[in-house]
Amino acid sequence: MIRHVAVFRFVPEFTMEQREHWMSLLRALPRHIPELRSMSVGPDVLGAPTSHELAIVADFDDLDGLAAYTRHPAHAEVLKISAPVKVSLATVDFEIPDAS
């Protein structure tokens, strides 16, 4: 399995209401992108100086699934919302070994 993690910081003008709407669109992506096995989305709860404001954790069977997600039109639509309000984005993609 491949795990995709993305953490964001946003401009202050990106309101909590707008963030909640954006997160609801992200949470709907597994219904539109079959390669997306699971997705967790949530705001930071600590507010530490080094914290990002929001995180996404998404799981895929393989790298092909991750590639399908990144180029899927539904994913592109969600990115259109975050692009103008994003201050920073950091991502990491890593393999989770089989439990067997």
Task: Give the label of every model feature segment.
Residues 1-53, 61-71, 94-100:
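Short S/T/G/P-rich N-terminal loop/turn motif that feeds into the first structured element of a domain
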Residues 70, 79-82:
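Short, flexible helix/strand-to-coil boundary loops that buttress conserved ligand/catalytic motifs
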